[in-house]
Amino acid sequence: LDLDDAILEELDVVVASVHSGFRQEGEQLTMRLVRAIEHPHVDIIGHPTGRILGERAAYDVDIDRVIEAAVRCGTALEINASPWRLDLQDTLARRAAEAGVMLAVNTDAHDTGELASHMRFGVAVARRAWLGPGQVLNTKPLDDLLAWLARRR
């Protein structure tokens, strides 16, 4: 991770995402994600397949190993609601939820105007994946969300 543990432990929520090295071998990319999942300060893995619709295909990652690690460590996977990402896609979100992974819908908004406009796309992915409120982190009541965030700290 790019930040020291001393900084990460001060944050309310830590989302780790791959933002470089997309052309690495699948094993390397998979291990980067698994190591991030295993990190005690990481709560959510952002855009787990790295795809950008119409621009970049998902990177070569073993999503089943990523899901297994997320289950084992209690790390959530993101449904990135940006209309240019929609990552995780519905079928992978369903697979993750069936395995016991918590999902988090994130707008990936880069300005306040995108908050509401993007969220509907993420909700649509979650619905297509047949996710219930118990499987989506940011539908939880505040006390439950705070308990979930405190579980590994």
Q: Where are the regions a protein language model picked out?
A:
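Charged catalytic cores and adjacent phosphate/nucleic-acid-binding surfaces used
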Residues: 1-153
